[in-house]
A protein has these predicted regions:
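Internal alpha-helical scaffold of NAD(P)-dependent oxidoreductase catalytic cores
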Residues: 100, 122-125, 143-258
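NAD(P)+-binding Rossmann beta1-loop-alpha1 motif at the extreme N-terminus of oxidoreductases
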Residues: 1-54
Length: 353
């Protein structure tokens, strides 16, 4: 206790983790760019609900709009800053909080995608840590309200994985594990980059598909052409990660090689993937929509270039062509530009070599 924590981005993941920290008595300040959300948090706090098994709670919180961040200059410097913004906002969010860090303070990327390098380019590698939130299924349905489309992961699934970029287990990584552990199961990892790429594979298999089809996670699972295309997306991303030397972890409760083989035409592996994904669907509300699908619905910019687009670019570096990821990236960008409307046929009628 006594550590000053700042969370830049009080959206679904930042709000969820931060609300639990506040509930546990930690000193947390939220900074967010959405005025209505900040105002609601100031007046009524944060409300956290779950689709199953967990009681609702509300906590009073301290929230600042980004334009009021300068108030931090009159206070004790921040010991820990969590950046929980969309990937395309990482640079400015890190720059914003950098000047308010304590000399031994550090920044934690609690985001999707691979943003540690961007953060390190601003504050230095020595002040950069990462934390993955795996299968957390949270969203922000209204100002001041965080909803999780499932229960807690608990012993069945470790949700948070905190680690140093160099892979050593340190007191800092253990401290982050303790803080996010208020929200759900957590562990310290010595394999941050492998964990990061594994989470990126999982996101690449669902986020962009939801964005361009307009379907929820449950609806995509019931659509065989889309379900198979998701496996191909994952297969390409896994091969890229392996080529870069990442030690991949389990992805969607499946061995990476099983997904990779399924995407390359192994029907036995495909049946294993289908069986596991249908089992997993019973633990999540059927109407849960992946975050990029939510962004598309709200008319917001997507992270497609930081997910499937990144897979394509990293594949090119090691001589791998990722046709499925390239096609999806193009379709999502066209939907973003309103050249196309979200439609499952964008995928079901797609023909690739």
């Amino acid at each position: 206790m006594g550590r000053k924590i700042v969370i830049v981005g009080a959206g679904a993941v930042g709000g969820y983790a931060g609300a639990h920290m506040v509930q546990a008595g930690e000193d947390v300040t939220f900074i967010d760019p959405w005025p209505e959300h900040v105002e609601h948090m100031r007046k009524q706090g944060l409300r956290v609900t779950h689709a199953m098994d967990v009681a609702e709670f509300s906590v009073p919180v301290r929230a600042l709009h980004v334009t009021d961040a300068q108030l931090l200059s009159k206070e004790k410097p921040a010991d820990i800053a969590f950046v929980c913004m969309k990937s395309y906002d990482t640079a400015w969010a890190t720059t914003l909080i950098q000047q308010y860090l304590a000399p031994d303070g550090y920044v934690v990327s609690l985001q999707n995608c691979m943003n540690e390098e961007t953060i390190a380019g601003i504050v230095g590698w020595g002040k950069t840590l990462g934390c993955i939130a795996s299968s957390i299924t949270v969203n922000l349905p209204a100002p001041g309200h965080i909803h999780r489309g499932a229960g807690k992961g608990g012993a069945a699934h470790t949700v948070f994985r905190a680690g140093e970029v160099h892979g050593r287990i340190t007191p800092r990584a253990e401290e982050i594990c303790r803080l996010v552990g208020y929200a759900d199961s957590a562990k310290v990892t010595g394999n941050l980059w492998g964990e990061r790429w594994s989470k990126l594979v999982a996101n690449a298999m669902g986020n962009g598909l939801s964005a361009c089809t307009g379907l929820t996670g449950g609806e995509m699972l019931q659509n065989e052409p889309i379900r198979r295309f998701a496996i191909r997306l994952g297969s390409e991303a896994i091969r890229v990660g392996q080529a870069h030397g990442y030690q991949l972890e389990e992805i969607l409760h499946l061995p990476p090689e099983t997904i990779a083989l399924a995407g390359e035409g192994d029907e036995d592996a495909m049946r294993v993937c289908d069986d596991q994904r249908f089992r997993d669907s019973k633990r999540t509300a059927s109407g849960q929509r992946p975050s990029m699908g939510q962004d598309m619905q709200k008319g917001r910019r997507t992270e497609i270039e930081f997910l499937n687009g990144l897979v394509v670019r990293e594949g090119e570096k090691v001589g791998l062509t990722c046709r499925a990821n390239a096609a999806l990236t193009d379709i999502v960008k066209r939907v973003e530009r309103n050249e196309l409307r979200p439609d499952p046929r964008h995928i079901s009628e797609l023909r690739l070599n």
